[in-house]
Amino acid sequence: MKFYRCSSPAPRFQAVTPGEKIRETSVLTSLVQPGAREKARQMVSGSSNDRFVVSRRRTGFGDCLWSLAAAWRFAKQTGRTLAIDWRGSCYLDEPFTNAFPVFFEPVEDIGGVRVICDDDINTRSFPGPFFPTWWNKPSFDCIYRPDEQIFRERDQLDQLFQSQRDSDANTVVCDACLMWRCDQEAEREIFRSIKPRPEIQARIDAIYREHFEPYSVIGIHVRHGNGEDIMGHAPYWADTERALRQIYNAIDEARSLSHAKPVRAFLCTDSALVLEQVSVKFPDVFAIPKQFQAPQAGPLHHPALGAEGGFSALTEMYLLARCDTVIRFPPTSAFTRYARLFAPRVIEFDLNDPGRLILIEDNSQALMAS
């Protein structure tokens, strides 16, 4: 096998997550109450001069955490309080429940930034004016946000972050996919600072001891979509048979690398079809049992599953990060961002040529060719 050194930085994927398509409801806009009457909007803890960054997401954990890192970075730079509002999560069937404390331990500070992340978010309100300016509208006008507005806000937030300047607004609302809007150190700070709830961590540790510890584990994440609009990931699935061959090739290449222990493959996917096909090709592959949607029926995780869907997702996300080698297909998926930052060896697919593999090891990159 030849390794061709790649001097350019890792590809900056500009994928738009399916979460961008979610329409807003009055339940989800109740956090921010624009208009006059500032005194009625004061936080319980402070004055009308307090300033905030509100990180609001309802999508998968990868997008939620990456976008949270971008919001945290801005809060850190500007001395603001960070509020985490994950109501309406795709992992819960309770729209008024903040998903963050359901899945993660409470945290009051992240890297010197004060954090609000409890379920009292329903009773809190934040002082105006707001940025982006759309949030200064009366609450009734905030019931629905068209896709164009969400994308516009994403770009406005990106410009604000890139400017390295603060906003005159008292509250900055980050309610868009903010992948690639912060440096890796900000992402690492988030993952170091927040911890899954003890019952989730216990599940992760138990599976690791039994199925991972005796082996050099190759973690394989395959984001298929199962009929969902996967948007930025779609080019990787333009030809399903070709995509599966690329995955098989990546597994073979990963197995051919040096390993300290006997090799075991661990598959995480949102598609029963992918699990079936990969298991036929590699009968020894290991997967955690979970409930799949019917073929082409849409996303793996949805509110009807309740919190168990979130427990399952976090278990796989954190186990992937503890693998010796991780294969990311496609590399545009935020679900494996944690693994990308912490796994010792990662294999990705070239954005411009998905047939080519990129080996990332010890912070260096190489193109893999057989």
UniProtKB/Swiss-Prot annotation:
Keywords, in A-Z order: Glycosyltransferase, Nodulation, Transferase
Gene Ontology biological process terms from the UniProt entry: oligosaccharide biosynthetic process
Domain of life: Bacteria
Enzyme class: transferase
Pfam family, one: NodZ
Entry's transmembrane regions: none
Domain GT23: 47-361
Gene Ontology molecular function: any one: hexosyltransferase activity
Xref: InterPro entries: GT23_dom, NodZ
EC number: 2.4.1.-
Protein family according to the UniProt entry: Belongs to the glycosyltransferase 23 family.
Function: Fucosyltransferase which adds the fucose moiety of the nod factor on its terminal reducing N-acetylglucosamine end. Uses GDP-fucose as the donor group.
Protein's UniProt name: Nodulation protein Z
Species this protein is from: Bradyrhizobium diazoefficiens (strain JCM 10833 / BCRC 13528 / IAM 13628 / NBRC 14792 / USDA 110)
Lineage: Bacteria, Pseudomonadati, Pseudomonadota, Alphaproteobacteria, Hyphomicrobiales
